[in-house]
Swiss-Prot record:
Family from the record: Belongs to the CLV3/ESR signal peptide family.
Protein name as it appears in the record: CLAVATA3/ESR (CLE)-related protein 2
Residues with PTM Hydroxyproline: P67, P70
Glycosylation sites: P70
Chain intervals for the UniProt region annotation (Disordered): 40-75
UniProt keyword terms in alphabetical order: Developmental protein, Differentiation, Glycoprotein, Hydroxylation, Secreted, Signal
Transmembrane regions: none
GO cellular component: apoplast
Recorded GO MF terms: receptor serine/threonine kinase binding
Cleaved signal peptide residues: 1-22
InterPro entries in UniProt: CLE1-4
Any Gene Ontology biological process: cell-cell signaling
Length: 75
């Protein structure tokens, strides 16, 4: 009987803690403003072909090599 009572109390505790820890939904207007505010910074940090040419790659193979494996030309 004590084991059943303990199990019931534990399940009740888990249920109440999950309800108390529930998050509230986000407001749509605030999310849109944040996304619009981040768009220019994303565009400014994205790499371009001009950046690769300025770095000196000019169509050469990359300096960094793959770790190898059974077939290094697989990808």
């Amino acid at each position: 009987m004590a084991k059943l009572s303990f199990t019931f109390c534990f399940l009740l505790f888990l249920l109440l803690s999950s309800i108390a820890a529930g998050s509230r939904p986000l407001e749509g207007a605030r999310v849109g403003v944040k996304v619009r505010g981040l768009s220019p910074s994303i565009e400014a940090t994205s790499p371009t072909v001009e950046d690769d040419q300025a770095a000196g790659s000019h169509g050469k193979s990359p300096e960094r090599l793959s770790p190898g494996g059974p077939d290094p030309q697989h990808h």
